[in-house]
């Protein structure tokens, strides 16, 4: 026979645990930025502060999508090894650091979100969210971070320090 105290403890535990369904456990270990090369083609820049990441994905924004629809995938690139420190992915010409070498171009009027993550763990970098038009007139040597319409601009040399403020 359960005592009133035991029943209260059990009910309290059930209520306390029922709120855990939305627990977010993703570990953020760096930042993703967007830049351009000397031809004006988009370049993803990933700063990893701790550990490693091994995949970059570009998806379109949520404009026009139903709540249950996923963002359209523009491309996913698997790194040839572990990304540490600062790494770059030229979207128009992925180099030998990437197993996936499919080039893509970004449309001026489209909204994009770029992420970097560790495939086998709940680890990622903070994403960058921008419109293709944000890259028009951008000079090489600078990196945008954050989310449109208020992107933060960093000199490329200072991007890692800004992303990993230890």
What are the residue ranges of the model-derived segments?
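Bacterial N-terminal signal peptides that target proteins for export
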Residues: 1-8
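C-terminal motif of bacterial Sec signal peptides marking the signal peptidase cleavage site
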Residues: 16-19
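Bacterial signal peptide processing site
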Residues: 21-24
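Short, surface-exposed binding/anchoring microloops in extracellular/periplasmic proteins
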Residues: 30-82
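Glycine-centered tight-turn motifs at strand-turn-strand junctions
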Residues: 77-99
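Extracytosolic low-complexity repeat regions of secreted or lipid-anchored proteins
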Residues: 93-163
